[in-house]
Amino acid sequence: MLRLNLRFLSFLLCIIQSVELQAAPSVPTFLTENGLTYCTHASGFSFNPQTADAGTSMNVVTEQIYNKLFDIKNHSATLTPMLAQSYSISADGKEILLNLRHGVKFHQTPWFTPTRDFNAEDVVFSINRVLGGHNTYLPTLAETNVTYSNPQYRVFHEQARKVRFPYFDSIKLNEKIKSVTALSPYQVKIELFAPDSSILSHLASQYAIIFSQEYAYQLSADDNLAQLDTHPVGTGPYQVKDYVYNQYVRLVRNENYWKKEAKIEHIIVDLSTDRSGRLVKFFNNECQIASYPEVSQIGLLKNDDKHYYMQSTDGMNLAYLAFNFDKPLMRDHEIRAAISQSLNRARIIHSIYHNTATVANNIIPEVSWASSVNTPEFEFDYNPKIAKNKLADKNLLLNLWVINEEQVYNPAPFKIAEMIKWDLAQAGVKVKVRAVTRPFLTAQLRNQSENYDLILSGWLAGNLDPDGFMRPILSCGTKNELTNLSNWCNEEFDQFMDRAITTSHLSSRAKAYNEAQELVLRELPIIPIANVKRILVANSRVKGVKMTPFGSLDFSTLYFIQEKY
């Protein structure tokens, strides 16, 4: 084994040398020598998580630039104060009063100089923006008869008009929040249509950042509102200094941060590599932390635990196979059950995830506070004999679509699709696999012309509340949308989910969520496949690494120790 690893390391060094010869935009040397480089992927990268695709990836950059009203404490349902110092809820559960923090300053950048501190108007603007309608207090941008002589100006205007908030749309936030008003400079009232215990968790998710209303108004006055999403201004521990598209983001310490000042002045977020490329850079000390490493190569770290270490945590995610209920054949429960019994999920975990994931026998990940140890065993686990008996004589030909992009919950989507195809072939089912892009799938769903029987997908949550985990992917309100790819609608499921948010007692909420989960596992609109661990590797000189179940990392706590190797 040692001889094999030495050969691999020799091969790796050759790769490193060849990579160094390739021309590509590079980070200035003085920054890499006087800061920390964090290697991650560029998939789905955006400076505005409000508009990012829901359930795909955690944006570590915006976690450093912006703050939220609340954060989530450890692996619990407890909220910790951020921009909101405290809150109270009315007796009828329909009003939330937020008391905001004083003395918080927005970033001063080449594109914006704030004239005031953070206050209630910023909260009102930020929440109203995702509620949509006419609540944003900004001019409408849907001008259809306006022409622009400058093509770049036209593109910016068109981009600004594409206001979509996938996560908040998926949880129907505009059907939960009736109004948001400032009662004083540091007090905000949120009025709900009905009591909803999940609201504060949603406001603690990665998507619920707080913008500067003053900055947005300035951009609107200049007819340049699109810049709100491309030139960020926040209150976080770091602010943006440079950005090279799909290559790197340079962050510099916010000297006026309201919490303890970050220890490292410069952070480079390298977006330029794939999974194996990140490990190459990591071993070459071109980055001191690498996220989403190639799991098949993680064993290399075990040979040198003096210089490197790995950190992992259970993730709030789920990879699954969805049945398209718009197809009559997929509404046959016996067929769905037999397809589930044909899948060797343990083989997928071993071959694709290299045991950095566990077989998912539930919908709610174990890391959630609502996860129950009393959930019944998954009824439709691998049983190829039963599957073949039920399916062999049906002569089925099924279309399996797979979104052609790597995600936390699915590092090799096409390979998993091929393994599913092979398993189903053993049961006598023919499968045609088709890789599709996310924009193509979105267009097909919009036209209700999606022609798949099965689709491989997954979900990644930004908080530990099952409302933001199960409602987007399984509720009637999201049928025929990008989140609910099964197009399943079950009123009893929705009733369980609604019951869970009408009480503030965690035990009652967990009971309702688990009843909803048991219904899903019986009806089987989706087959759970894997819960994936969040993994990163770090140089032993880097300390203060604390990763959350969502994959986020607070750069402000990172620091170097002085050992030299």
Curated annotation (Swiss-Prot):
Q: Which InterPro entries match?
A: Peptide/Ni-bd, SBP_5, SBP_5_CS, SBP_5_dom
The keyword Transmembrane is annotated on this UniProt entry? no
- State one Pfam family annotation: SBP_bac_5
Kindly list the GO molecular function terms attached to this UniProt entry. peptide transmembrane transporter activity
Keywords noted in UniProt = Peptide transport, Periplasm, Protein transport, Signal, Transport
Q: Which GO terms describe its biological process?
A: peptide transport; protein transport
Per the UniProt entry, the signal peptide is: 1-23
Which locations, inside or outside the cell, does it occupy?
Periplasm
Look up the record and report any one GO term of the cellular component aspect: ATP-binding cassette (ABC) transporter complex
Query: Per its database record, what is this protein's job?
Result: Involved in a peptide intake transport system that plays a role in the resistance to antimicrobial peptides.
Per the similarity annotation, which family is this? Belongs to the bacterial solute-binding protein 5 family.
The protein's name is Peptide transport periplasmic protein SapA
Protein species of origin: Haemophilus influenzae (strain ATCC 51907 / DSM 11121 / KW20 / Rd)
The record's gene field reads sapA
